[in-house]
A protein has these predicted regions:
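Membrane-interfacial helical/loop segments at transmembrane boundaries in membrane proteins
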Residues: 93-110, 143-154, 182-212
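Juxtamembrane/interface segments at transmembrane-helix termini
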Residues: 21-41, 94-98, 128-145, 179-192, ...
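Alpha-helical membrane-embedded segments
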Residues: 13-21, 122-126, 171, 210-247
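Juxtamembrane inter-helical linkers in multi-pass membrane proteins
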Residues: 32-57, 137-158, 192-202, 240-270, ...
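Iron-sulfur-cluster electron-transfer modules
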Residues: 2-135, 278-287, 309-315, 322-518, ...
C-alpha cells in the first residue's frame, strides 16, 4: 500500500493524465468522423459482429495467417497487454486498499501465475521484435520502393522513433511491474505461482524491497498514465482500433465496391476522394488500425514488380497526415477542409493507377484495412471530376460508350463467336435453364472465344437447355468501375439490369470472373439480384451428375487462381476438382488459392500500359508457373479467366517453353471428346475482326531480376498436395425434351491471327 503522500500525488497525476488521454481519444474520434458517411452497412447484425470481433481479436487468427514466428512473439505482447488491463486495475487498487490474493483461493493463484508468466512473455516478445526490426537483416524490414511517395514524417524517421518509444514504454511498464512483484517476493518468500518474480527476487533484499515496491508501482502505473496522452498518436493505438475494424467490417465480399451516389446536378458534386475528408470514415479508421507490418506490401503485385504503389505506405501516410492536422490544424476535427490533396501526400498518381484491385492487401491485412477502396475513390475523383485519365483508358471508355465493349468493335458482331455452333438467344429460347453470360472478351477476343466455344459444346454434350442474350448483352462495366468511371459503369449496368430483369434468368453462368462478380454481386446495388455461377462450378456439377465424362490426359497441369474468382469470390475447389480428373499430374503453384499472385489485368490495367517498374506483373507470375511445371514433356497452365489467359499468353519467350495456356473448359472438352471418340479436336472461333489484346514485350530479358521488395519470389515451401476429387452426384436440371442439338461442326479450326499491340517498355525511373 502507498504512503499517504504518494496516494495524493498518484491521484493528482492520474486525474491529469486521464483528462489529457481522454481529450486525445475524443479528438481522435473527431478526426475519424471527419470522413464522409459510408454507403456500406457497418453495424447491422450487431450480435454477430460483436462475436466476430471478439473471436478474431482473442484468437489473433488473422495475424497468424502470415509470418508465424513473428506472429508468435507478437501474441506474447497482445495477450500480455490484454491481461494487463486487469493487472493494472488490481495493482492500482492495491496501492490504496491492500489486495490479498491468497484469500481468493484458486482464482487468486491463477491470477498471480498468469500475471507473472505473461510479464515474462511480454518482455521476451518485445525484445525479439525489437531485435528483428532494428538489428537482424530481413527482407521484410521496414523499407519502401524508391518510387513510393512517403510522407515527410516517414522520411524524417518518425515511424522508427515511434516504434522505439512504444517498445521502451512496454519494457519499462512491464519491467517495473515485474521488479515490484519480485521485491514483494523478496520479503514474503518464494511463491510457486510466481516463478518469474521468484527468479528476480534474488536481486533484492528485505531492506531495499519497500523502495523497489514503490518504484515498481510508480514505474508500472505511472508509465501507463503518462502514455495515455501519447497513446492516440502512436502505432500502439491499433490494439483498440483493430477490434473496432472487425466490428465495422463490410458484410459483402471484397469484390463488391462501395456504391456511389451520382449527383451530377449538385453545384459541387462529390464524386470520389480528393482530400482526407472525402474518404468514408472507415477509411480514416483504417489509418489508425494499421499495424504498420507491411504485410500488404509483401503481397502487392505492383510493389513486387518495382512500381510506385505500396498499400502500406498509403495507410501510414494517411495516419501521419491526420496526426499533423491534429497538431497544426485542429479545425479539421470540426469540419474545416484539409489543406492537401491525397495525391500530394498519400500516394502518387503513378501509384494510384498501378493498382490491379487484386485484393491481396485486403486478404492479408491482420486488421482488415482496405487500401484498395481508397485507390478506387481517388480514381473516381480523377476521372469524373479532375478529368485526369490515362490515354489508353480513354480509348476503352469510348469503346464502352459507343459500341458497348471496351475493344470498340461493332456491337453487331457480338454473336459472331458462335458461328457454326448450336447457340440460341433468349429471343429464340426465352426460358432456358441456363443463361450463358458470354462477356466482351469471349465475344471479341480470339483467345477467349475458344473458351466460350468449348463451354457451349460441353453444354450441348450434356444436354443442357441454355441460351445467350446475343446483341442484348453489353459490357458489365467492370473495367469502367475499377478505373473510377462510375458514371459509365452505371450506364452499362443499368442497361444490363433492365435486360436481365425482363429475361428473368433461372441461373446465369459466366466464363469471366469479372462478369460473374459484377452481375452476381455488384448489380444487387442497383436492383439486379441473380444467381450467378462460374463456368467451372457448373461444369463440376455436370461431371458430378454424370452428364459429362472425361478421359484423363498425360499432361502436367498447374492452375492459376484468378483474383476475381478466388480471393474476391472464394471459388477455389471447382477448377481443381475438374483438373484432377483431367490429369494425373496436377501441381500447385507456390502462391495459390487466397495467396495467388495477380496476372496484372485487373483494375482496368488490361486496357492501359503498366506503370513504370522492373518487370510486368504477368511475367512474374508466368516465371513461377514455368518453375512449377519444370521439365515435364507436356505442360499446361490452366486458367479460369479470359484476361488471365491473355496476360499470361503475352509473356516474352513463352513459345520456347512449350507451355500451353488453356481454360479449364478447353481442357475438359478435350477429355470429353477423347472419351467419346471425337478426338482431341477443339472447335475454335471463326476468323473475326481482331481485338487489341495486351502488350507483347520485345526487349525484356528472359529472366528479369525481381525488385528487392518483400516476397517478390515465391515461397520456398511448396503447397501441400490435395486429395484427388471424386465426383459426387449433384442436383442439376434434367435435360429438356427440346429437339436434339445440331451436331458440332467438324471443320478444322482456323488459326487465330496474331494479336498486335504496341510493345511495352519500362519507363525511366524519375527520382
Amino acid at each position: 500500500m502507498l504512503p499517504l503522500t504518494h496516494k495524493i500525488l498518484f491521484l493528482l497525476f492520474a486525474a491529469i493524465m486521464i483528462a489529457l488521454g481522454g481529450r486525445g481519444f475524443y479528438r481522435l474520434y473527431r478526426r475519424i468522423r471527419a470522413g464522409r458517411e459510408d454507403t456500406d452497412q457497418r453495424f447491422n447484425n450487431l450480435k454477430k459482429r460483436i462475436a466476430y470481433s471478439l473471436i478474431t481479436t482473442l484468437t489473433q487468427s488473422r495475424t497468424f495467417r502470415k509470418r508465424p514466428v513473428v506472429s508468435f512473439f507478437h501474441s506474447f505482447i497482445f495477450y500480455g497487454f490484454t491481461f494487463y488491463l486487469l493487472v493494472n486495475l488490481v495493482d492500482a487498487i492495491d496501492g490504496f486498499i491492500p489486495v490479498s490474493l491468497d484469500s481468493l483461493g484458486l482464482a487468486g493463484r491463477v491470477y498471480a501465475f498468469l500475471a507473472d508468466i505473461l510479464s515474462a512473455l511480454v518482455l521476451v516478445g518485445v525484445v525479439a521484435l525489437v531485435l528483428r526490426r532494428f538489428l537482424l537483416p530481413s527482407r521484410r524490414d521496414f523499407r519502401f520502393n524508391v518510387r513510393t511517395l512517403l510522407h515527410e514524417d516517414v522520411r524524417a524517421n518518425k515511424i522508427t522513433l515511434d516504434s522505439l518509444i512504444v517498445s521502451a514504454f512496454i519494457l519499462f511498464h512491464v519491467g517495473s511491474r515485474a521488479m515490484g512483484a519480485a521485491a514483494l517476493v523478496a520479503v514474503q518468500g518464494p511463491r510457486g505461482d510466481a516463478p518469474f518474480a521468484t527468479l528476480l527476487s534474488h536481486l533484492f533484499t528485505p531492506q531495499n524491497a519497500f523502495a523497489w515496491r514503490i518504484f515498481g508501482y510508480w514505474g508500472a502505473l505511472g508509465s501507463v498514465l503518462a502514455f495515455l496522452a501519447y497513446f492516440p498518436y502512436s502505432k500502439h493505438i491499433h490494439i483498440f482500433m483493430a477490434p473496432l475494424k472487425y466490428l465495422a467490417a463490410r458484410d459483402v465480399t471484397s469484390g463488391v465496391l462501395p456504391a456511389l451516389t451520382l449527383d451530377m446536378e449538385a453545384d459541387t458534386p462529390k464524386l470520389g476522394a480528393d482530400k482526407l475528408e472525402d474518404l468514408a470514415w472507415p477509411r480514416l479508421l483504417d489509418a489508425y488500425a494499421c499495424i504498420q507490418c507491411n504485410r500488404c506490401q509483401d503481397v502487392c503485385p505492383a510493389t513486387a514488380t518495382g512500381k510506385a504503389l505500396s498499400p502500406s505506405a498509403l495507410e501510414i501516410n494517411k495516419r501521419l497526415e491526420l496526426n499533423e492536422l491534429a497538431l497544426h490544424q485542429p479545425g479539421f476535427e470540426n469540419g474545416a477542409p484539409s489543406p492537401s490533396p491525397l495525391l500530394a501526400f498519400a500516394l502518387s498518381p503513378e501509384a494510384a493507377w498501378a493498382c490491379t484491385t487484386c485484393g491481396a492487401c485486403l486478404e492479408v491485412c491482420p486488421v482488415q484495412d482496405e487500401p484498395m477502396l481508397d485507390i478506387i475513390d481517388i480514381r473516381r475523383h480523377q476521372v469524373m471530376i479532375a478529368g485526369e485519365i490515362p490515354t489508353q483508358l480513354q480509348t476503352a471508355f469510348r469503346g464502352m460508350e459507343r459500341t458497348k465493349n471496351p475493344w470498340g468493335i461493332n456491337h453487331d458482331k457480338r454473336l459472331d463467336w458462335a458461328a457454326g455452333l448450336n447457340v440460341r438467344t433468349t429471343d429464340e429460347n426465352p426460358e432456358p435453364d441456363v443463361l450463358f453470360w458470354v462477356g466482351c472478351a469471349a465475344s471479341y477476343d480470339p483467345q477467349s472465344q475458344k473458351t466460350a466455344r468449348a463451354f457451349v459444346q460441353l453444354l450441348d454434350h450434356a444436354g443442357v437447355d441454355f441460351a445467350v442474350l446475343g446483341k442484348r448483352e453489353c459490357c458489365t462495366g467492370d473495367s469502367a468501375r475499377r478505373a473510377g468511371n462510375e458514371y459509365l459503369y452505371r450506364q452499362l449496368a443499368d442497361q444490363n439490369v433492365a435486360t436481365l430483369n425482363a429475361v428473368k434468368p433461372k441461373l446465369i453462368v459466366a466464363t469471366c470472373p469479372h462478369c460473374m462478380n459484377a452481375v452476381g454481386k455488384e448489380y444487387k446495388q442497383i436492383g439486379g439480384d441473380y444467381k450467378v455461377m462460374h463456368h467451372t462450378e457448373y461444369l463440376e456439377q455436370l461431371v458430378a451428375s454424370g452428364r459429362l465424362a472425361s478421359d484423363t490426359g498425360s499432361a502436367t497441369v498447374t492452375y492459376h487462381d484468378p483474383c476475381y474468382l478466388g480471393r474476391h469470390n472464394g471459388v477455389y475447389d471447382a477448377p481443381r476438382n475438374l483438373l484432377n480428373i483431367l490429369s494425373n499430374t496436377v501441381v500447385e503453384l507456390d502462391r495459390n488459392r487466397e495467396n495467388s499472385f495477380c496476372c496484372g489485368a485487373g483494375g482496368a490495367q488490361f486496357w492501359k500500359e503498366e506503370e513504370p517498374g522492373t518487370e510486368r506483373i504477368s511475367d512474374n507470375r508466368y516465371r513461377e508457373a514455368r518453375q512449377a511445371l519444370g521439365n515435364a514433356d507436356e505442360k499446361v497452365l490452366a486458367v479460369g479467366c479470359p484476361f488471365c489467359k491473355s496476360m499470361l499468353e503475352s509473356t516474352p519467350g513463352k513459345g520456347a517453353d512449350a507451355i500451353a495456356i488453356k481454360d479449364v473448359a478447353e481442357l475438359l472438352l478435350e477429355g470429353v471428346q477423347k472419351r467419346s471418340g471425337a478426338g482431341q479436336h477443339v472447335d475454335a472461333a471463326p476468323p473475326a475482326e481482331l481485338a487489341p489484346a495486351i502488350p507483347i514485350v520485345q526487349s525484356l530479358p528472359a529472366e528479369p531480376v525481381p525488385a528487392s521488395i518483400p516476397e517478390t519470389a515465391p515461397p520456398t515451401e511448396r503447397a501441400p498436395e490435395r486429395k484427388k476429387w471424386t465426383p459426387k452426384a449433384a442436383a442439376l436440371p434434367k435435360p429438356t425434351e427440346a429437339p436434339s442439338p445440331a451436331p458440332t461442326p467438324e471443320t478444322p479450326q482456323p488459326e487465330a491471327a496474331p494479336v498486335v499491340r504496341k510493345a511495352w517498355n519500362p519507363k525511366a525511373n524519375k527520382n
